[in-house]
Amino acid sequence: MNFPVLKGAGYVLVHTPDMIMHNGTTQTTEKIVNPESEYLKKLPEHLRSFEDVVAYAPNQTYIGSMTPEALGEIAMPWWTEDKKVAGADRYGKLGEIMPQDEFLALMSASDVFDLVLFEKEFIEGAKAKLAAHPVVGNLAESVNAGVELAEIEKQLSEFHAEGLYNNGKLVGCVKRAHDVDVNLNSHTMLENLAVKASGVLALANLIAKNNVNPAEVDYIIECSEEACGDMNQRGGGNFAKALAEMTGCVNATGSDMRGFCAGPTHALIAAAALVKSGVYKNVIIAAGGATAKLGMNGKDHVKKEMPILEDCLGGFAVLVSENDGVNPILRTDLVGRHTVATGSAPQAVIGSLVLSPLKAGGLKITDVDKYSVEMQNPDITKPAGAGDVPEANYKMIAALAVMGKEIERADIAAFVEKHGMVGWAPTQGHIPSGVPYIGFAISDLTEGSVNRTMIVGKGSLFLGRMTNLFDGVSIVAERNTGKVESGSSVSTEEIRKMIAESMKDFAAHLLAE
């Protein structure tokens, strides 16, 4: 069977410290219910510099400059001064970390309806920095001209615009796109322009770092957790086409796929199916980050005298292509899914996502070398009381292996060590869900000693208040054997002709009798 392959991946982080206070929902909610809170007063003292963000080991892992194994060798917590990565660079093997001023310029470049305004002096400097960028420098030409600060202040005070800040100062705004449509108000437009711009950055990095010809991309599936539309269709879309337009994918179309945190794995399976079926040759899944989740666990971090670690937007892009005999294959016949009948018990959930597809392929849990689950950074989640999320997932998988008599109970810790990884991804919902390992998996399954991995995505659908059901899907990726079908199989049209000729011969035979 000719399976599709994982051809390349790109990962980006965008340091947005000012958006924590002004756009993260933990902070914006606090401003409403308790505007004089000690938390809001102390928060600015707990913001990290761009240099500290770049030198943070989990961030270096996210962009491919450090392996998960190397990160796991560093004792936690990772945020302390003595754990900074010496000589850390903003550019990595798999992507990059972008500073806030460059990103604000990229947001302006992503604006095609003249909704983003910036103060003249600020945007001139930010535009110059963006123009020097090795991957998206060409987009600086699309940055809007600056205006006087008074015009921005007027938009905020009279027309309900949303402010954009840098180093604590007002430098711009996002205007509303409609006078009364809440789906096009300034708050929504800011969120959507941020997810678009960070998605563009991720897609551009995928293209640049994997020598992808954007003109050969057929289809893009955008799988973030935002929605764009208007009052008549608030989730109508389409981020995917918007990303394609900005990254030179002139022959691509696309659509948006949603599933909360499980969205990226749903998109990965859909991309694999589209390529496997022959509908498209090259399909990209991509997503930008969520401003709402910035500083989500900030109260706990400040309470424990930590820096605010949720200070970056995340983004990623993955290319799925036809079998090239080299890159890892996606086993479209080994797909796990949490069905309506599965239920929400942890054992049932993990069983449906891990055990069921492996059994279908005659495999054991221990036959998978590495599992990529919810790869949240425990530096963020443990102080907030959420524990080590990846480790908890691995222990549940190990427990299933114990129940299946594949390992002994005493071997659970060893299983977690061998088949698991420490978490390194930001808590941006869809961003840490399964996909952060794909960039490493491509290397591990081609140049390394890994032969089989499983990408697992899980989602909490109850957040949308439409169902109490849980969700999740998974897919196995394997080392490529190098065998590629020649494509000499008989086509449907040829089969029809053969049947017609056989029927004709049969009819002639009957007439002869």
UniProtKB/Swiss-Prot annotation:
EC number: 1.21.4.2, 1.21.4.3, 1.21.4.4
Keyword list, A-Z: Oxidoreductase
Keyword Oxidoreductase: yes
Transmembrane segments: none
Enzyme class, UniProt record, top EC level: oxidoreductase
Domain of life: Bacteria
Pfam families: ACP_syn_III, DUF5940
One function term, GO molecular function aspect: 3-oxoacyl-[acyl-carrier-protein] synthase activity
Catalytic activity line of the entry: acetyl phosphate + [thioredoxin]-disulfide + NH4(+) + H2O = [thioredoxin]-dithiol + glycine + phosphate + H(+); acetyl phosphate + methylamine + [thioredoxin]-disulfide + H2O = sarcosine + [thioredoxin]-dithiol + phosphate + H(+); acetyl phosphate + trimethylamine + [thioredoxin]-disulfide + H2O = glycine betaine + [thioredoxin]-dithiol + phosphate + H(+)
Keyword check for Oxidoreductase: yes
GO biological processes: fatty acid biosynthetic process
SUPFAM superfamilies: Thiolase-like
Protein role: In the first step of glycine, betaine and sarcosine reductases, the substrate is bound to component PB via a Schiff base intermediate. Then the PB-activated substrate is nucleophilically attacked by the selenol anion of component PA to transform it to a carboxymethylated selenoether and the respective amine. By action of component PC, acetyl phosphate is formed, leaving component PA in its oxidized state. Finally component PA becomes reduced by the thioredoxin system to start a new catalytic cycle of reductive deamination.
Subunit structure of this chain's protein: Heterooctamer of four alpha and four beta subunits. Component of the glycine, sarcosine and betaine reductase complexes, together with proteins A and B.
NCBIfam families, A to Z: reduct_C_beta
Protein's name in the database: Glycine/sarcosine/betaine reductase complex component C subunit beta
Gene designation per UniProt: grdC
